[in-house]
């Protein structure tokens, strides 16, 4: 924490520090058919590019915010308010039971509960916009039931029912329903998408015995104006409708993880300061409607807990990498350093704008 002279606001610069993958053999084959430079937990620099697992998200954010903090300190900016620098684990949308259920924003909650709660927060994450709100998420586990079978039993034998084949029908119905959910719940700058993300059934080492259960896991994003409980109700209505349409279908479901969305009023000081910074660096007016957002971050919880928060970023993903990178999301491990510089300037502008004036002026 860089302490000001007094009378100003406490501004937190924040980024998570965890990666979404382990960076070991447990990632394959789920990340793709081969391991590329962006998936490896090893740094590799090629000209102005940095490769390695998480080098873009979150490591580029951590490095950029640390440099902004250092610049303010070394320039002896006459701060009235305090400038805090905070990083925490648990920012990736995962939950890890064998690590004390790490994930789901547990790190930022720990930080806030132990004296780190600020007046305002700037979260650095990808995309070159200023977001005043972000979605939450709701995770569901759906189990389709059949009976334990045997490959030597003819189809139609009484007492033997597949769980996998009806689960396939459920998957297709769910895939058709999710876009309608998104359209129905889109508002503000948040587009809450949903994706089927994992399947589990039976034993690969026992292919002769079809499983009595097939589990379907999916993530549904939560608009700040919609609670996780409301999302659960919408999913519940849809799945009960499937049961009504197919009496032979046997399934159960639960929401096993959730975080709320969060929104800061657009009129709030930190939102307006960040937009002024964006306009100053970009040299053009901030657009009325940026690209709609579906990605969840710790910023959602910060806002839900009452901390006015804005998300700032840079163009992402970087284009023209000189190394091969994975298709799709990959390891979020390809960073082009010049892309980060305008974002650093915007955040620095907002820091000076916020921390050099009386707190009362910003909290009117």
Model-found features: residue ranges?
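Active-site beta-strand termini and strand-to-loop segments that position acidic
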Residues: 1-5, 304-305
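Active-site metal-coordination/substrate-binding segment of hydrolases
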Residues: 8-84
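Residues at beta-strand starts and edge strands
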Residues: 9-11, 81, 136-138, 212-216, ...
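Short beta-strand segments
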Residues: 14-16, 86-87, 122-125, 143, ...
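Catalytic metal-binding/acid-base residues of hydrolase active sites
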Residues: 18-20, 127, 200
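Charged, glycine/proline-rich intrinsically disordered loops and linkers
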Residues: 23-48, 94-112, 319-331
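Acidic/histidine-rich catalytic neighborhood of metal-dependent amide-processing enzymes
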Residues: 49-52, 56-139
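Metal-dependent amide/peptide-bond hydrolase catalytic core
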Residues: 141, 145-364
